[in-house]
């Protein structure tokens, strides 16, 4: 996808349309959906401004407040998928203040650029796939039918018939399991990540590049023909792509369309500044400030400006309040939205409405074994009631509770499915109660199982 088509896609995605798309996957939380839809539209509006004014318009970062499992991450991830934007999710607690052992906050920007680079690279590889396939086919045939030369160094033509015969077999898949020895490019040496002072990740990348030059660039491998074709196609596609152009496009996308989702931001909020572990947490907040305000981060693909990256902070804020963040950081998240805890009615909708609804997933999974599930309305009601009850009695983990409830409910059917081929199983309220009622009553047991 080119920058132009990305801009065109943004133009089509009006705030209403964005909310409609998000509704396909996330139930409720209208306020949060509206906030991200407006933030997305403002990106397109900014692209339309004169350049001198464009640089003045900075994205309004969003702070999502709400318990776990209510859709914070899903809203941000679906938004990024909608516009094919680079997206990374990081946890605020994984970072340490500059000068301490651990990851420095700039690494989140480097991760974003890496994601952006891989996205652009895959798009470019799709464009050259047909040509790469033809070139890979020729290389593979060279291995299967080595060229014969005359004493004068002229290639003999008699191998042409054999070559064409093998080409047809190759395309039909008749040679897939045959073993062939090919010469492949050696991958970069894997290195174990080391926790250390800031900048070490960048140094690690440079060392990898140096070592890759010292190690033989090619080696011979024996693989099946099917795998050989894939390896050679990948190599040929990479040769056809201008990696410098990919890097430039990746940086542009990361700078102008990138989204960084900072989860558990409430865990670095400090109630009593200047004491105990709060000192380090406050340090992480201060290290985040320049990135949120706009700075330049050096990456292996080139310098990246963070001025127009959209940051979405998220946290439950049970133990702390947004006002416990340092004032400067609070100011960097001008848009605040509160996500509501999920109710039984929400659970009922989550089970059936989204395109990736859990009931639909289980129906399709078991259909592969020729086992047909049917969920009645009273079963959906009962599953939702049980999920809400367990969330109330134990830890409230939101919609994630439905996964554990459904897994336990269908455990026996999933286990015995191969022997149940051709059967249709009706899941009704009676079935749900029989499987789960005792577990729900036993609070201690439900803590461990559900």
From Swiss-Prot:
GO terms for cellular component: HslUV protease complex. This is ATP-dependent protease ATPase subunit HslU. GO terms for biological process: protein unfolding; proteolysis involved in protein catabolic process. It is found in: Cytoplasm. Belongs to the ClpX chaperone family. HslU subfamily. It comes from the Bacteria. The keyword Methyltransferase does not apply. ATP binds at residues 27, 69-74, 263, 328, 400. It comes from Aquifex aeolicus (strain VF5).
């Amino acid at each position: 996808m080119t920058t132009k088509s990305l801009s065109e896609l943004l133009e089509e995605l009006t705030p209403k349309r964005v909310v409609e798309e998000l509704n396909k996957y996330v139930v409720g939380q209208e306020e949060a959906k509206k906030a991200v839809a407006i933030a997305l539209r403002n990106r397109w509006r900014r692209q339309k401004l004169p350049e001198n004014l464009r640089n003045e318009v900075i994205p309004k970062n969003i702070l999502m407040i709400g318990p776990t499992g209510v859709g914070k991450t899903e809203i941000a991830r679906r938004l990024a998928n909608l516009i094919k934007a680079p997206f990374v999710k990081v946890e605020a607690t994984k970072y340490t203040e500059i000068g301490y052992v651990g990851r420095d906050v700039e690494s989140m920007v480097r991760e974003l650029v890496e994601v952006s680079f891989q996205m652009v690279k895959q798009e470019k590889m799709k464009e050259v796939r047909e040509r790469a396939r033809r070139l890979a086919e020729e290389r593979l045939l060279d291995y299967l039918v080595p060229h014969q030369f005359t004493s004068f160094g002229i290639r003999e033509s008699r191998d042409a018939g054999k070559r064409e015969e093998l080409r047809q077999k190759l395309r039909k898949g008749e040679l897939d399991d045959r073993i062939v020895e090919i010469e492949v490019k050696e991958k970069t040496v894997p290195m174990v990540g080391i926790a250390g002072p800031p900048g070490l990740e960048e140094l690690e990348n440079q060392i990898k590049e140096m070592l890759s030059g010292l190690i033989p660039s090619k080696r011979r491998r024996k693989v099946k023909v099917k795998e050989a074709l894939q390896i050679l196609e990948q190599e040929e596609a990479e040769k056809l792509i201008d990696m410098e152009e990919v890097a430039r496009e990746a940086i542009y996308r990361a700078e102008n369309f990138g989204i960084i989702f900072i989860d558990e931001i409430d865990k670095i909020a400090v109630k009593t500044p200047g004491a105990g572990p709060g000192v380090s947490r406050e340090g992480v907040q201060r290290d985040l400030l320049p990135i949120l305000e706009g700075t330049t981060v050096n990456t292996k693909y080139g310098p990246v400006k963070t001025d127009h990256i959209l940051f979405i902070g998220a946290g439950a804020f049970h133990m702390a309040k947004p006002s416990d963040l340092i004032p400067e950081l609070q100011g960097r998240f001008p848009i605040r939205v509160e996500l509501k805890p999920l109710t039984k009615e929400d659970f009922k909708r989550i089970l059936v409405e989204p395109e990736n609804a859990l009931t639909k997933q289980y129906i399709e999974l078991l259909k592969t074994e020729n086992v047909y599930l049917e969920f009645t309305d009273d079963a959906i009601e009962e599953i939702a009631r049980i999920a809400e009850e367990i969330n109330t009695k134990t830890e409230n983990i939101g919609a994630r509770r439905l996964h554990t409830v459904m897994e336990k409910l269908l455990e026996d059917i999933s286990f015995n499915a191969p022997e149940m081929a051709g059967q249709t199983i009706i899941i009704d309220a009676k079935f749900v109660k029989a499987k789960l009622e005792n577990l729900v009553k036993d609070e201690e047991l439900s803590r461990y199982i559900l």
